[in-house]
Amino acid sequence: INSEHCRHKIFGGTFVIDGVEQESSLFQMIKKTTQENPNKIISAYKDNVAFAEGPVIEQFAPADQSKSDYFQIKDVKSVISLKAETHNFPTTVEPFNGASTGTGGEIRDRMGGGKGSWPIAGTAVYMTSYPRTEEGRPWEEILPVRKWLYQTPEQILIKASNGASDFGNKFGQPLICGSVLTF
């Protein structure tokens, strides 16, 4: 099956606005922003991770890292890795493990991009239909309740958050912030 899981057929497909087919896909338009205005972007859309210029930081490390040497403090130009991992279908089917392995893919891609990087923190964003956690919310009554094929929105929001943070914590990348959008 050729799913939307990693291929992003929607972003790479034909993009139509008001019945007019656009010359670029949505993904091509997103890439064009970085091409025309790179600002501090060092690398993007390669290795499944982007790198941007970071601040100058103090590093406490061996003077010569190729051999045993004394430690010193020195200023180092840093590079920040930026990564988003979509794991929509796996998280819908099994939220804890789907989001957990999404975090794993994000960590893997950061560590494997360019010369590699050191993941230090993660974020997560969850978007679902109304979770209907309580009765009597008028905004949720606009749409009829439906049967869910895999998990309910409430199950996804709770279990996916637990899975993403569990995996990140085990690999030294705590989940430090996130966002929830229900509609």
Q: Where do the PLM segments sit?
A:
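Long, structured ligand/cofactor-binding scaffold of large enzymes
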Residues: 1-183
